[in-house]
Curated annotation (Swiss-Prot):
<dbReference type="GO" id="GO:0070814">
    <property type="term" value="P:hydrogen sulfide biosynthetic process"/>
</dbReference>
<keyword id="KW-0411">Iron-sulfur</keyword>
<keyword id="KW-0349">Heme</keyword>
<dbReference type="GO" id="GO:0020037">
    <property type="term" value="F:heme binding"/>
</dbReference>
<dbReference type="Pfam" id="PF03460">
    <property type="entry name" value="NIR_SIR_ferr"/>
</dbReference>
<feature type="binding site">
    <location>
        <position position="483"/>
    </location>
    <ligand>
        <name>[4Fe-4S] cluster</name>
    </ligand>
</feature>
<dbReference type="GO" id="GO:0050311">
    <property type="term" value="F:sulfite reductase (ferredoxin) activity"/>
</dbReference>
<keyword id="KW-0560">Oxidoreductase</keyword>
<dbReference type="GO" id="GO:0050661">
    <property type="term" value="F:NADP binding"/>
</dbReference>
<dbReference type="InterPro" id="IPR045169">
    <property type="entry name" value="NO2/SO3_Rdtase_4Fe4S_prot"/>
</dbReference>
<keyword id="KW-0198">Cysteine biosynthesis</keyword>
<feature type="binding site">
    <location>
        <position position="479"/>
    </location>
    <ligand>
        <name>[4Fe-4S] cluster</name>
    </ligand>
</feature>
<dbReference type="GO" id="GO:0000103">
    <property type="term" value="P:sulfate assimilation"/>
</dbReference>
<comment type="function">
    <text>Component of the sulfite reductase complex that catalyzes the 6-electron reduction of sulfite to sulfide. This is one of several activities required for the biosynthesis of L-cysteine from sulfate.</text>
</comment>
<keyword id="KW-0408">Iron</keyword>
<keyword id="KW-0521">NADP</keyword>
<keyword id="KW-0028">Amino-acid biosynthesis</keyword>
Length: 570
């Protein structure tokens, strides 16, 4: 064994309270149904506060008015975030019309938020509208099962590959993996869809009675696009094609970005290559990875419970051998693959079937009618006439997919009139933020509300140094949990306190290297001053085609993170 830190396969010790909660929940039922009828509070109480996450919801409140309400002796304005399960981000126009109506009529904020996990969220659902939202989703063939908490979350799939045929095949696998790893409990159907309690005993053959130790994220990726940021995910199937046809996958396991400020036992980690598998073994291997993590993941410390930590504790080879044993296969050597970028191709792209795909840039993924830019109304109008489907991308954008030549002009006219095709700089197209304030309870600094004006300033710096036609992959995340995927950016800002961020440099354009902290706890003017100097140097000193992140490493501005489990904090 050449492992650096082989440790115990199972961590002994006192289990976390989350483990007690799951065990006592009667397969995720808890007392959610009773709590729904409690009109004294706008929120869910006790264990239910966490159990609703397994049903795709987070309880939040509006932090902009929290102090004011406390002064008035009122409880926080509780409202739920709901995240839909949408493998591969594909949504029909009929489904879109239904979610548009619900967002407008039944949420506080009236918006649809596209996320970088290729689905949509509603923010601001009051308790009385919680059951109706699940029933609305069900009526159009959608659900929110397992999009949060200790399960396999929404499965991602490259949205707009160069080979349309490959997308169809890869997308089918994303759906199959998602379905295969879903919880089997009937709690969701009983509570939200009023389905009868059946006398049979619940069983969870894959996830187990206490589900997974921590969240688990899966992707299907079609090189050379890495739009789904595979290294942020626990389990990744990299599509290998021969003559444009999918033949199998390379498996990479153990990526993840979440850290805790100052806690050196936490680290972001890129995924490890396990090997190649033919298509027919895909579901067996997916199940084997999940059950190995189920059995070996750390249930005594939630900050050390993700797959990345299990791999480092037991060793990559040990984990891989166990997956092979459980799946009954031997991995073949990794097949060659490479990534060239991860941005979306904004605008019209022709597919191989003579249909067109229109990728619309949606800043921060927030779909709402703004003054002079009625984005939400425009998309609704397109949904009413478009015969194909919509695809949400992992960059929080939206693709109008499968447009015949004869419909192009009509759809483009609506898109332009609604501000959906306004020209933006390459820099803005390659920047991203998580939601953060006012709804996220974990937020330490602004992200979504900060990004637009911050990018205005970056655009000015790019123009000043003569590189306006270039871009730097730039991301802002409001806290170190890392939903904005700043820990795979060339320039990553991680929220530390209101108005203050840690500045990370040295990632790359392809998303295969973790950036290192360059400056800690600094303000926007300090960030801009640093970037002004560094962008100026990059513009003058870079080699042909050299991205900003690679330049900062080559020029010795920042040391590259080579082995994140051991050198991220050095």
């Amino acid at each position: 064994m050449s492992e650096k830190h082989p440790g115990p396969l199972v961590v002994e010790g006192k289990l976390t309270d989350a483990e007690r909660m799951k065990l006592e929940s009667n397969y995720l039922r808890g007392t959610i149904a009773e709590d729904l009828n409690d009109g004294l509070t706008g929120g869910f109480k006790g264990d239910n506060f966490l159990l609703i996450r397994f049903h795709g919801m987070y309880q939040q409140d509006d932090r902009d008015i929290r102090a004011e309400r406390a002064e008035q002796k009122l409880e926080p304005r509780h409202a739920m975030l709901l995240r839909c399960r949408l493998p591969g981000g594909v949504i029909t126009t009929k489904q879109w019309q239904a979610i548009d109506k619900f967002a407008g009529e039944n949420t506080i904020y009236g918006s649809i938020r596209l996320t970088n996990r290729q689905t949509f969220q509603f923010h601001g659902i009051l308790k009385k509208n919680v059951k109706p939202v699940h029933q609305m989703l069900h009526s159009v063939g959608l659900d929110a099962l397992a999009t949060a908490n200790d399960m396999n979350r929404n499965v991602l799939c490259t949205s707009n590959p160069y080979e349309s045929q490959l997308h169809a095949e890869a997308y089918e696998w994303a759906k199959k993996i998602s379905e295969h790893l879903l919880p089997r409990t009937r709690a969701y159907a009983e509570i939200w869809l009023d389905q009868e309690k059946v006398a049979t005993t619940d069983e969870e053959p894959i996830l187990g009675q206490t589900y997974l130790p921590r969240k688990f994220k899966t992707t299907v990726v079609i090189p050379p696009q890495n739009d789904i940021d595979l290294h942020a995910n626990d389990m990744n199937f990299v599509a290998i094609a021969e003559n444009g046809k999918l033949v199998g996958f390379n498996l990479l396991v153990g990526g993840g970005l979440s850290i805790e400020h100052g806690n050196k036992k936490t680290y972001a980690r890129t995924a490890s290559e396990f090997g190649y598998l033919p298509l027919e073994h895909t579901l067996a291997v997916a199940e084997a990875v999940v059950t190995t993590q189920r059995d070996w993941g750390n249930r005594t410390d939630r900050k050390n419970a993700k797959t990345k930590y299990t791999l480092e504790r037991v060793g990559v080879e040990t984990f891989k051998a166990e997956v092979e044993r459980r799946a009954g296969i031997k991995f073949e050597p990794i097949r060659p693959y490479e990534f060239t970028g991860r941005g979306d191709r904004i605008g019209w792209v022709k597919g191989i079937d003579d249909n067109w795909h229109l990728t619309l840039f949606i800043e921060n993924g927030r779909i709402l009618d703004y003054p002079g830019r009625p984005l939400k109304t425009g998309l609704l109008e397109i949904a009413k006439i478009h015969k194909g489907d919509f695809r949400i991308t992992a960059n929080q954008n939206l693709i109008i997919a499968g447009v015949p030549e004869s419909e192009k002009a009509k759809i483009e006219k609506i898109a332009k009139e609604s501000g959906l095709m306004n020209a933006v700089t390459p820099q803005r197209e390659n920047s991203m933020a998580c939601v953060s304030f006012p709804t996220c309870p974990l937020a330490m600094a602004e992200a979504e509300r900060f990004l637009p004006s911050f990018i205005d300033n970056i655009d000015n710096l790019m123009a000043k140094h003569g590189v306006s036609d270039e871009h730097i992959v730039m991301r802002v995340t409001g806290c170190p949990n890392g939903c904005g995927r700043a820990m795979l950016a060339e320039v990553g800002l991680v929220g530390k306190a209101p108005g203050r961020y840690n500045l990370h440099l040295g990632g790359n354009r392809m998303g295969t290297r973790i950036p290192r902290m360059y400056k800690e706890n600094i303000t926007e003017p300090e960030i801009l001053a640093s970037l002004d100097e560094l962008i100026g140097r990059w513009a003058k000193e870079r080699e042909a085609g050299e991205g900003f992140g690679d330049f900062t490493v080559r020029a010795g501005i920042i040391r590259p993170v080579l082995d994140p489990a051991r050198d991220l904090w050095d």
